[in-house]
Amino acid sequence: MGLFDIFKSKPAEQEEKKVEMQSDFSNFEQVTEYLYYRSGITDLSKRRLSLNELRSFSQREKIYTTADFLAKLKVDNEFYQEVLNIITVNETFFFREITELEWLVSLIQSSTGDYKILSLPCSSGEEVYSILILLDEQGVDISRVELFGYDLNSVMLERATKALYSERSVHKLSEVQKENYFFKNSNGIYEVIPRLKKRVQFEQHNIFELDGKNDFEIILSRNMFIYFDEVKRNAAVDIIVNLLKEGGHFIKGHADNIYKHPSLKNVCYGVYKKEE
């Protein structure tokens, strides 16, 4: 059975079967192609879980054909956002791939200037708060840094703004770190303290619609490129280079492959400097 066959009718209880017989999700590739055009995400045809979730979502919305799904996707921004939220869920946790974060902290610690830092995509915010915790632990005045988190997923951005995290999200933190930087409620949920939260601003953006120039000293874009084909990867790198100030640094994820941009010099594993 092909991956897109999951959108075809399946036997179930009698009433559901009656509705399913009217469904026609052939050519669902048209939907994934449109999502690629809008978001740059290319690997949907390989992700059975996301496709299953889209199938369930379409039934909840009482949409039973590819044509209707695609038509609504093009004109209904709220519907499009819900679809994006389904296909862009990315679980993360505090201190993930910490080596590069420690390098970032040492860079700021050894300088006297202020830093604008962008996490793109920021998911549910663990990365930016990890940076603040590490900076504060090293005695860096965190008023020197202004952090921004950009993401497509509105659900993830809401979580990041609330800064509420499960035990799993903070499992790499020490008990002292949890005590110093979080309030723990009666349900076992950890909330980041206000002193850190006020240093971060979260915004909804599509990387391919960003047109700023020389805005940031540091950009972290980790494990985003794995969702793009070569064309979109190269376009994303070009945009990141434009967003970086001269002499600024770009940090990629361990799983990311990027092309050798002429303005980027590799200074250590996963870290690149925009040459002045």
PLM segments and residue spans:
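A short glycine-rich, Lys/Arg-flanked "PGG" loop and its adjoining helix->strand segment in the class I
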Residues: 234-246
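A short N-terminal interaction module
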Residues: 2-115, 218, 244
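Short, well-ordered alpha-helices that flank and scaffold nucleotide-derived cofactor binding pockets
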Residues: 106-109, 133-137, 162, 242
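Core SAM-dependent methyltransferase catalytic element
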Residues: 258-276
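Conserved class I S-adenosyl-L-methionine
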Residues: 114-127, 146-148
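Extended basic-aromatic, gly/pro-enriched interface segments that bind polyanionic ligands
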Residues: 143-220, 224-228, 232, 257-258, ...
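Conserved beta-strand signature within the Rossmann-like core of class I S-adenosyl-L-methionine
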Residues: 247-254
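Conserved SAM-binding loop of SAM-dependent methyltransferases across substrates and taxa
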Residues: 124-140
